[in-house]
UniProtKB/Swiss-Prot annotation:
Residues 296-307 have a biased composition (Polar residues). Gene3D superfamilies: Farnesyl Diphosphate Synthase. The gene is Agr10. Keywords: Magnesium, Metal-binding. InterPro entries: Isoprenoid_synthase_dom_sf. This is Sesquiterpene synthase-like protein Agr10. The lineage of its organism: Eukaryota, Fungi, Dikarya, Basidiomycota, Agaricomycotina. It comes from Cyclocybe aegerita. Belongs to the terpene synthase family. Residues 287-307 are annotated as: Disordered. It comes from the Eukaryota.
Amino acid sequence: MSLNFFLRRYTVFPWSRKLGQYYHDAKRESSAWTESFHPFDEDLSKAALTFCITALLASLAYFLRQKEIVRLGCDLMNIFYVFDECADIADKEGASQIRDVVMDDLHRPEKTCPGGEILPGEMVKYVLLLCPEIPETYYNTKSFGFAPQSSSPQPHIVCATLSRISMPTQQQWFNVKRTIGPNVFLARSATVLPYAETHTFYHPRMIALREQAPFLDINSYPMKVRGLVQGSINWLEGYAAGVQAAFLDNIANLPSCAKEVESRVNIYVNELAQWARGNDDWTFESGRYFGDRGPENQSDIPTSSNR
């Protein structure tokens, strides 16, 4: 069944599409690494992983970073995919248990799990033990995105699982969106602007940028709620336009800082914006939301998506 709607292009954003030079190598290596765990019993799941091109998002978001960072981003995207596969077939309690094990592995990767390791946890341990230089701030309980948020008693993956079987309101969807996907990419950007620089990192405009970046994406919403009418999409576009205007205003009015900090601030802010730009391009290019018609639909024309 096909759902037709109209989306405006994401062309007024000052940041353009940029794909890192390490994309193909990082994608190949990360795919081989993921497949070495034999995570999928069915060819369909493996095909879906390839179809969604999870490595593409990491390469679009970190196009200026060294190969190791791009590869790490690809690995994490694949871990998220495997995590979702496990949670999709679990009930609420089971998804919570998976989350708890993975959280424990994040903070104590050297610990042996007495009850046996689950696959997402095993993959997380491998990454953290292989890359001990990853700052703790990168995978703290909030930034990594696996932990419950203070505003919601449920782990994000449980909320996301429940949203598949119920029709969330716009506010409910916004609450879930604050806790998922983007946080890991925004957290990776934080490594160039250490948390120790509290005055800069926690300035109100910098906080606002981090909160606004995930909401620059509206393209995934029609697929998630399975049935938005065009009027609602128009409302979302207006909402996103307001977020974008506020995002750009915050960048233009960031406070002055010491010269030695300014370069890191610029990198940090540009990575926040480039993630938003890359996520929009990935939405159309990956096949996740629009199948093989993504490039065709990335224009000011009526858009079709399989329901």
